[in-house]
Amino acid sequence: MLDHPLNSLGFAKPPAATRVVVAMSGGVDSSVVAAELAAEGYDVVGVTLQLYDHGAALAKKGACCAGRDIHDARRVAETMGFPHYVLDYENTFREAVIDEFADAYLAGATPVPCIRCNERVKFKDLLQTAKDLDADCMATGHYIQRKMGPAGPELHCAADPARDQSYFLFSTTPEQLAFLRFPLGHLASKAETRALAARHGLPVADKPDSQDICFVPNGNYAEVIQKLRPGAADPGEIVDLSGRVLGEHRGVIHYTIGQRRGLGIGGLGDPLYVVRLDPERRQVIVGPKEALSTRIVPVREINWLGDAPLTSRSEWQVMAKVRSTRASREAVIRPLSDTEAEVELIAPEDGVSPGQACVFYAPGDSRILGGGWIWRGAR
C-alpha cells in the first residue's frame, strides 16, 4: 500500500481519518480554525472550557470563555456540523491561575495570567482531554507558527507582527508542541481571519476581539483581588529612595513598576515613578525615571526550546522581550541551571517588573527559544 501524502496538519492520512480537537473560546479566531478544518474534511471536535463564574461575565463584551462565548462556540459548531462539548474547569482555573494572580499582586509582582492559563490549563488539561478523545492533534486560534526544524517542531512568531502571541506561549513544551497545531499563524492580518469567518457564514464574523483579563470584569483587577484576599488593599507609606515618607498609598496591589500617574504626591519637582514595591513593609518606593533603568534581569522557571541544552553554553546571544507590548532587544543569557539564568540587556530598559515574562528569540530569525519569569533583584 502506497503511503498517503501528508495532509495540511502533517499526518500521512486523509483528513477524514484525522481527528482534531479545536480549543474554542467562542471568538472569531478559534471559530475560523474549526470551520476551516471542518471544511477541509477533518474529523473536528470542538471543546470549550468554562473557566470561571459567569454571573458577572455573562454579558461582558471583550472577555473570552464567558457564558455568551460558550453559546457562540456552540452556534459555530452547529453551523459547520461538528460535535461540541463544554467542560467545567472552574475549580482548576481558580487553583492554577486566579489564586496565583492574586498572590502575585500581594507579593508586589505584576503577573501575566494568560501565560499561566495556556501553560496549566489549555496546554495541559485540555490537551490531555484531546488525547483522551483519541485526537491526532489539538488546534487553537493563537497567532503563532509551528515549523518543522532539523530537531523537530519549532515555535515561530506569527506572520503578522501586530497579532503575534509568542510572548504568551513561551512556556509551551516540546512535548506539547508535537501535539499542537496553529492554523492561523501564517495569515498576514486579522482582516484575513474575518474574511474567512464571513466566507463560512459564521455568526461570530464581526465579533469584537477579546480584551483585558477574562476573569476581571471591567478591568478592575484590584476589586477581584480584594474579594479573593480580604485585607489586600491595606494602606501604607509612599517613600523615596532614601526612605523619606512622601505620602500614603491605597494598597500595594494598586501599583506597578514604572507607574507615574495616580500616586497622589504631586508638587515635589521632577516626576516620580514607582521603582520598587515592598509588600512586607507595605511600602511603595518611588524615584526619578533614571532609577527605573534595568540591565540585569534574574529569570527562573525557564522553558528552553533551543536544540542544544541551555547549560551547554556559558552564554547565549539572543533577542529578549520583557513586556508583551515592547519590541525584543539584544540580550545575553548566562545560565545558572537548567531553569534559572541571569539575563543581561545590552541596552537598559525601564519598568522591568517581577511577575512579567522574559521571552527569548533567535537573533535574525522568527524562532522562539523559550523564556522564563522575571524574579526580584533586577538591577
From Swiss-Prot:
It is found in: Cytoplasm. It comes from the Bacteria. It is an enzyme of class 2 (transferase). Residues 163-165 are annotated as: Interaction with tRNA. GO terms for cellular component: cytoplasm. The record marks 142, 356 as: Interaction with tRNA. Pfam families: tRNA_Me_trans (PF03054), tRNA_Me_trans_C (PF20258), tRNA_Me_trans_M (PF20259). Disulfide bonds join 117-214. GO terms for biological process: tRNA wobble position uridine thiolation. The keyword tRNA processing applies. Keywords: ATP-binding, Cytoplasm, Disulfide bond, Nucleotide-binding, RNA-binding, Transferase, tRNA processing, tRNA-binding. The active site is at residues 117, 214. It catalyses: S-sulfanyl-L-cysteinyl-[protein] + uridine(34) in tRNA + AH2 + ATP = 2-thiouridine(34) in tRNA + L-cysteinyl-[protein] + A + AMP + diphosphate + H(+). HAMAP family: tRNA_thiouridyl_MnmA. Catalyzes the 2-thiolation of uridine at the wobble position (U34) of tRNA, leading to the formation of s(2)U34. Belongs to the MnmA/TRMU family. This is tRNA-specific 2-thiouridylase MnmA. The lineage of its organism: Bacteria, Pseudomonadati, Pseudomonadota, Alphaproteobacteria, Rhodobacterales.
